[in-house]
């Protein structure tokens, strides 16, 4: 049904990973949580595509200044008939709370294991989020609030890791050519 992905949290210095952890939490887990929430709270069965639309359009990891909503269609689990309900960003905040908490805990764990001299660099330069999960509204704010460290999303979060890896490979090739 869902392919398993991970969220990787790392402190990188001089092209190498100093401290890292990987948790079995990613975008698909957000979708699963929304499906479960809709079933439990509204007796509404929705598919993964609908859950992803909810996540993209009104999903929240942090309280929005104004509540946003969208109409969601699914199958009423009591009657078996199609049903449309209005879902709010506050509901997605609740649905995603457990998963976003796991991400924050993993970030906190990596920061605790970071050597003091690098911890100072992280405090100065901040935390950079990459990948699809970083596009969830409010994840930056949540991590920043819980860690006290400036948090931002990479310019192109969906390709940032791949581009960075490519640049590092080019760098290594250049180093080898110089030897």
PLM segments and residue spans:
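Acidic, glycine/GT-rich loop-and beta-edge segments that sit at the periphery of enzyme/chaperone cores
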Residues: 47, 66, 167-179
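Short, surface-exposed connector motifs at secondary-structure boundaries
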Residues: 16-18, 120-125, 147-150
């Amino acid at each position: 049904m869902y392919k398993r992905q991970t969220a990787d949290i790392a402190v990188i210095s001089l092209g190498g990973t100093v401290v890292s952890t990987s948790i079995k939490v990613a975008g698909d887990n957000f979708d699963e949580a929304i499906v479960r929430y809709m079933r439990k709270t509204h007796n509404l069965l929705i598919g993964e595509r609908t859950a992803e639309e909810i996540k993209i359009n009104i999903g929240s990891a942090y309280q929005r200044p104004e509540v946003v909503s969208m109409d969601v269609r699914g199958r009423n689990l009591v009657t078996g008939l199609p049903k449309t309900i209005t879902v709010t960003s506050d509901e997605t905040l609740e649905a995603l709370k457990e998963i976003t908490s796991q991400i924050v805990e993993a970030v906190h764990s990596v920061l605790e294991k970071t050597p003091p001299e690098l911890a100072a660099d992280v405090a100065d330069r901040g935390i950079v989020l990459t990948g699809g999960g970083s596009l969830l509204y409010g994840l930056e704010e949540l991590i920043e609030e819980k860690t006290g460290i400036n948090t931002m999303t990479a310019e192109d979060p969906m390709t940032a890791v791949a581009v960075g890896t490519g640049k590092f490979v080019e760098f290594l090739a250049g180093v080898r050519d110089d030897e």
